[in-house]
Amino acid sequence: WEGDAGLLHMVSDRGWLHRTRPRFEAEHLSGLSPIDSHRLRDTDGTPLEGSAADAESLSLRHDTNGKLGDTELWVSFERDHRLQRFRPDGTSLAAPIRPEQATGAAANKGMEAMTRHPEHGLVLGLESPPRGVAPKETRLFTLGDQEWRYPLAAPTGSALTELTADGNDLLALERAFAPPAPLVISLRRIRLGEPPELDIETLASFSSGDGWWLDNMEGLTRLSDGRLLLLSDDNASPLQRSLLVCLRPR
């Protein structure tokens, strides 16, 4: 969410950036207006394709400084595990960074979650336990030397899909997909302590078995007034949907 411009930035796992403007009526989400779309490009201007284009998470910089036009986008990628900075038009601003902490992540279980913390800077999370880490536990880390052990939620198949900052806390989105068990989406609060310690509180858990209209929720951002936007990935499947959901925490 870009507070200065009131725009929602989205990234696809096929290497596209999309800028949109959510529409609200009486504080309820009523629609989404597309603004523009751009291909992500490498440092030589070549559009990213194939496994190199598998973008997963997005974090903004200079998005709430009261100045339009200077927003930078940090994008994390799976399969070729790396981070890279871009302009909103998809132009690369720097060579990719390959964090050592992503070593051991499975090809499609890498840096799925990312946000900017006011004290720690960029905080990234691996979707699932990397090699050498206990089951049901994954890793949060900074680009420095800080690492935290993150215990995943109880539902079978839980995986970390996104992070967003909420003051000095983090909000985490998890998805549990393990058929024939119901699809479960969990929203959790994280308080980072002295690495590797942290405290976690589960704020809400939504199960398709209870009648909730859910899908593959992988995006999470916080609006300026505290409302949350959740976005699903349809996996390019005609059987799934891309959903945008607005929640207001109590």
Predicted features and spans:
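Sequence/structural signature of beta-propeller domains
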Residues: 1-250
